[in-house]
Design a protein with these regions (language model features):
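Structured aminoacyl-transfer and RNA-binding surfaces used for tRNA recognition/handling
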Residues: 1-174
């Protein structure tokens, strides 16, 4: 049977539904999960569904080691309740160089110079290249909503050091 049975098919024409099925190379008997809503929540829910289905259908080879480097994190996460950005990693993580020019114009699109090592779905290590520019660090503190007193009290030693220059540096921690 090649018919579509869903709670959302009433919102699409038959032509639209066929285009969706063709786009994903769907065949009769396939099941598609389509979700809409807030991107972060949608991705988390679909990820949980993927893992649950893999467990139920015994699709996970527990004898196989599957390491993965995750390298394209957003630098910031927007909190809708507080109407401000938070650091995804920490406030000293540098943006990837090609995203520096977007810090002011589109901070939500800036990608962090960070990395996690994941083994079979579990994070086993994480790190980043740190900010080594005074101006960039000040801009990040500003985007995080920190005032001068706040960042000076907490990180005055770092700010002072950055005024004199620092080499690019980074690290990774396991555990």
């Amino acid at each position: 049977d090649s018919s579509v049975k869903s709670s959302f098919d009433k919102f699409f024409s038959e032509k639209d539904l066929k285009q969706i099925l063709n786009k994903v190379s769907s065949k009769p008997g396939d099941i598609l999960f389509i979700m809409s809503g807030d991107k972060k929540n949608t991705l988390e829910q679909m990820g949980s569904l993927r893992v649950e289905l893999a467990k139920r259908f015994d699709l996970i080879d527990h004898n196989k080691m599957c390491p993965l480097w995750v390298t394209d994190f957003p630098l910031f996460e927007w909190d809708e309740d507080e109407k401000r950005f938070f650091s995804m990693h920490h406030p000293f993580t540098s943006p990837k160089p090609e995203f520096l020019n977007q810090l002011e114009s589109d901070p939500g699109k800036v990608i962090a110079n960070a990395y996690d090592l994941v083994l079979n779905g579990n994070e086993i290590g994480g790190g980043s290249i740190r900010i080594h520019s005074f101006d960039t660090q000040m801009k990040v503190f500003e985007l995080l909503g920190m005032n001068k007193e706040e960042y000076t009290d907490q990180f005055g030693f770092l700010i002072e050091a950055l005024k004199y220059g620092a080499p690019p540096h980074g690290g990774i921690a396991f555990g």
